[in-house]
Amino acid sequence: MSGNTYGKLFTVTTAGESHGPALVAIVDGCPPGLEISLADLQHDLDRRKPGTSRHTTQRQEPDEVEILSGVFEGRTTGCSIGLLIRNTDQKSKDYSAIKDLFRPAHADYTYHHKYGIRDYRGGGRSSARETAMRVAAGAIAKKYLATQGIQVRGYMSQLGPIEIPFKTWDSVQDNAFFSPDPDKVPELEAYMDQLRRDQDSVGAKITVVAEGVMPGLGEPIFDRLDAELAHALMSINAVKGVEIGAGFASIAQRGTEHRDELTPEGFLSNNAGGILGGISSGQPIVAHLALKPTSSITVPGRSIDVDGNPVDVITKGRHDPCVGIRATPIAEAMMAIVLMDHLLRHRAQNAEVKVATPVLGQL
């Protein structure tokens, strides 16, 4: 099975299944000397882990990460960093009734056709459980980026039909939804409570922002920074769309509105989302992710079995009624991994490039 590694100079490889004994990751290319601790990684893992509120899956996984290699006396050595998280709360019997059935909107049908064999327990490799290792690896990237003045953070900007206006970063860590508007939290809670009573699920929109990124990151033509971000963010489970900057709203904009004019004091807008011609402009990099509703619900759905016979499928087990609630740390991790990789690639080729033109901020 290919496709388990992302990056060229800063690479992240993951392995493991939802109900296997453990999840693992190998992070390669991190420069030596970076101060890193278990607490650095655990902070983001605790933000993503299941069972932290009544609005997420009740699977209880501590997601305690172990560093197996690449760190000595609290600093990276420049060697491969091995990471491990043990699975502790699998209930595989919940899935025995559907081992020969294909759950609608899941990867069951496509994995079956591609490989001829699949781990049906909790979705196996296709489960969002895999993203725990991305978050652990992304924490390393975030720690290094911080030494370069780069900060990556995200928030939920929509849950189902409820749009969430951005008010303050201070609110994001104070509620289960990563909502930047504290006044919206009661409405979000009421909506999710009703959704559980309906035994249904809903989608969400996540916004992730990187500030402090210098101009110059991105490798035209095929490795444009926005293309790489779209690739990485689309690889997250349940993501069905990615926008950079104004995204699809730019369709209705006129050129006089969309163009981000430059002044000696800074850019006048950021419709480009901090990327021009596939290269970072120095403005905040802004991406939006659309996540589909969770496919695992107890409302019967029509499908077929492995022999092609019609069946009704009811998915048991413990699932998130909205996967977007826990997606913010995952989106942050993937953006950080992309920026880390491109920072090292830019440094390798263009470290000696100097221009007299000032770096503009955004007004």
Swiss-Prot record:
Pathway: Metabolic intermediate biosynthesis; chorismate biosynthesis; chorismate from D-erythrose 4-phosphate and phosphoenolpyruvate: step 7/7
InterPro entries assigned to the protein according to its UniProt record, in alphabetical order: Chorismate_synth (IPR000453), Chorismate_synth_AroC_sf (IPR035904), Chorismate_synthase_CS (IPR020541)
GO molecular function: chorismate synthase activity; FMN binding
Named cofactor requirement(s): FMNH2
UniProt remark on cofactor binding: Reduced FMN (FMNH(2)).
Catalytic activity: 5-O-(1-carboxyvinyl)-3-phosphoshikimate = chorismate + phosphate
Binding site for NADP(+): R48, R54
Matching Pfam families: Chorismate_synt (PF01264)
Keyword flag Amino-acid biosynthesis: yes
GO cellular component: cytosol
EC numbers on record: 4.2.3.5
One of the protein's GO biological processes: aromatic amino acid family biosynthetic process
Group of enzyme by EC: lyase
Keywords: Amino-acid biosynthesis, Aromatic amino acid biosynthesis, FAD, Flavoprotein, FMN, Lyase, NADP
PROSITE patterns documented for this protein: CHORISMATE_SYNTHASE_1, CHORISMATE_SYNTHASE_2, CHORISMATE_SYNTHASE_3
Endpoints of the signal sequence: none
Ligand binding (FMN): R125, S126, S127, N237, A238, G277, K292, P293, T294, S295, S296, R318
Keyword Lyase included in the entry's annotation: yes
Top-level taxon of origin: Bacteria
SUBUNIT field: Homotetramer.
Function description: This reaction introduces a second double bond into the aromatic ring system.
Family recorded in the similarity comment: Belongs to the chorismate synthase family.
Protein name per its UniProtKB record: Chorismate synthase
Species of origin: Pseudomonas putida (strain W619)
Gene from which this protein is expressed: aroC
